[in-house]
Swiss-Prot record:
Gene3D superfamilies, sorted: Ribosomal protein S11
GO BP annotation list: translation
GO molecular function term, any single one: rRNA binding
Protein name (record): Small ribosomal subunit protein uS11
This protein's UniProt keywords: Ribonucleoprotein, Ribosomal protein, RNA-binding, rRNA-binding
Protein family per UniProt: Belongs to the universal ribosomal protein uS11 family.
UniProt cross-references to InterPro entries, sorted A to Z: Ribosomal_uS11, Ribosomal_uS11_bac-type, Ribosomal_uS11_CS, Ribosomal_uS11_sf
Listed HAMAP family: Ribosomal_uS11 (MF_01310)
The keyword Secreted belongs to this UniProt entry's keyword annotation: no
Protein task: Located on the platform of the 30S subunit, it bridges several disparate RNA helices of the 16S rRNA. Forms part of the Shine-Dalgarno cleft in the 70S ribosome.
Gene that this polypeptide is encoded by: rpsK
GO cellular component assignments: ribonucleoprotein complex; ribosome
Subunit-structure text: Part of the 30S ribosomal subunit. Interacts with proteins S7 and S18. Binds to IF-3.
Pfam name, any one: Ribosomal_S11
């Protein structure tokens, strides 16, 4: 016997005019997350989720497409002004910032929060190609 469907309130759209865009650009992928000022996720996208696989995920074009998708979803929730936090050494940093700017957001600030070790863990060995 099929379960009866639960009838409840529909999820109401929250209007979040000011938010923060977090861009995490690694060597293999780029992840863009839009949050409100308290850090609750509003929308996100990544190069892999946008349909890119393998080494194409690490390209600037993939980061641009992912940033555009995340920005569009954030704008549906009423976001108009963003601050941008950039983390990581990846190649998608600049293009993701440009895509967010081109999506029509008013950019309040851009801050680089890449963690820099004070001689912490040993880095991976150099590649020999």
């Amino acid at each position: 016997m099929a379960r009866p469907k639960r009838v409840g309130k529909k999820k109401e759209k929250k209007s979040i005019p000011v938010g923060v865009a977090h861009i995490q650009a690694t060597f293999n992928n780029t992840i863009i997350t839009f949050t409100d000022t308290r850090g609750n996720t509003v929308s996100w996208a990544s190069a892999g989720q946008s349909g890119f696989k393998g080494s194409r995920k690490s390209t600037p074009f993939a980061a641009q497409i992912a940033a555009d998708q995340a920005a569009r979803r954030a704008q549906e929730n009423g976001m108009r002004t963003v601050g941008i936090f950039v983390k990581g050494p990846g190649s998608g940093r600049e293009s993701a910032m440009r895509a967010i700017n081109a999506a029509g957001f008013k950019v309040a600030f851009i801050r680089d929060i890449t963690p820099i070790p004070h001689n912490g863990c040993r880095p991976p060995k150099r590649r020999r190609v």
